[in-house]
Amino acid sequence: MKFVDEVSIRVKAGDGGNGCMSFRREKFIENGGPNGGDGGDGGSVYMVADENLNTLVDYRYTRHHEAQRGANGGSTDCTGKKGEDLFLRVPVGTTVIDASTQEVIGDLVTPGQKLMVAQGGWHGLGNTRFKSSTNRAPRQTTPGKPGDQRDLKMELKVLADVGLLGLPNAGKSTFIRSVSAAKPKVADYPFTTLVPNLGVVSVDRWKSFVIADIPGLIEGASDGAGLGIRFLKHLARTRVLLHLVDLAPLDGSSPADAAEVIINELTRFSPSLTDRERWLVLNKADMLMDDERDERVKEVVERLQWEGPVYVISAIAKQGTEQLTHDLMRYIEDRADRLANDPAYAEELADLDQRIEDEARAQLQALDDARTLRRTGVKSVHDIGDDDAWDDDFEDDEDGPEIIYVRD
């Protein structure tokens, strides 16, 4: 199934049913009182988190969703039937955003969680509601209120405990294959991974955690280059990040330079994401002699001024991976215990999570806006500065012929 993590849809709640104007008419009762019933309320639209879904592909081609309208009121004080609510099932981890205001309506992070995104219209009133001591035969009714209509943007962020960072061909997919039952595609060319992959890592049989692999980052990713920038948001909800570095790149490049590129791009994408717990994992150690391996490890650590945990592994040979997974499991459990017992720590992490979410959304929105400007041919702020510099080189052409470009 195709992986889709961003869609835009329009939802419309049902309108309320109209009130009825009716009077009681029976044998021997010629002038009975009013008995027009109220209309029914319109159906509302809800989002429901479904743990059996992992993509938003169902909403890629079906963009309009409308709940049922409430039935009109009837005679003999019959109230119209309420419109049926519409339940849209989405994967756990979906964020619902109002497209017009960019307001976050809610996050669906637990299975079965419901979120109302459009309120059904209020029912209209029948003429029975307007009778009084001075108005025995009212002919007044009210129509049902229209239901809410909203343009929504839905963003899916996979829920994983551990996220993998690294350049293409750093061995992220090989690592996730070696520690879990996931089987992502592995090849000797860049960008083998095109969509996020999830794997469940079992530790000591009864313990497990989820690990996420996203497409590799390249230099300039924070400006929209490559694939990884669109998927960095999936790491926003992870508990710990593993920064994978290839110790023996095929092109002979410096592992320290590659590690520095990832740090720079991560900082530009979301400064708060760099405050997340990160571990340095140096991969493909089996391809080097011991002296050369130790020298490259030292170079990377010194270049990054790294003070956190460092692991030297070989994912394909499964060297050092078991110790790494056990340490990850221990960290995740200790973190959960501290969250439960330390309110200050829990508040600090909640604030960090919110800052990461806000920065990631702002960065991706800026990239979307820039892409829209390019498609429409409108210059962005950065492009205007470049054109002004270009015009300065041709100030001597003021006396030349004037050329006017007209867009069809």
From Swiss-Prot:
Main location: cytoplasm
Polar residues bias: start-end ranges: 129-143
Residues that hold Mg(2+) according to the record: 173, 193
Biased amino acid composition, Acidic residues: 385-401
Listed EC numbers: 3.6.5.-
Binding-site residues for GTP, renumbered to this chain: 166-173, 191-195, 213-216, 283-286, 314-316
Keywords: Cytoplasm, GTP-binding, Hydrolase, Magnesium, Metal-binding, Nucleotide-binding
HAMAP family: GTPase_Obg (MF_01454)
Protein name per the record: GTPase Obg
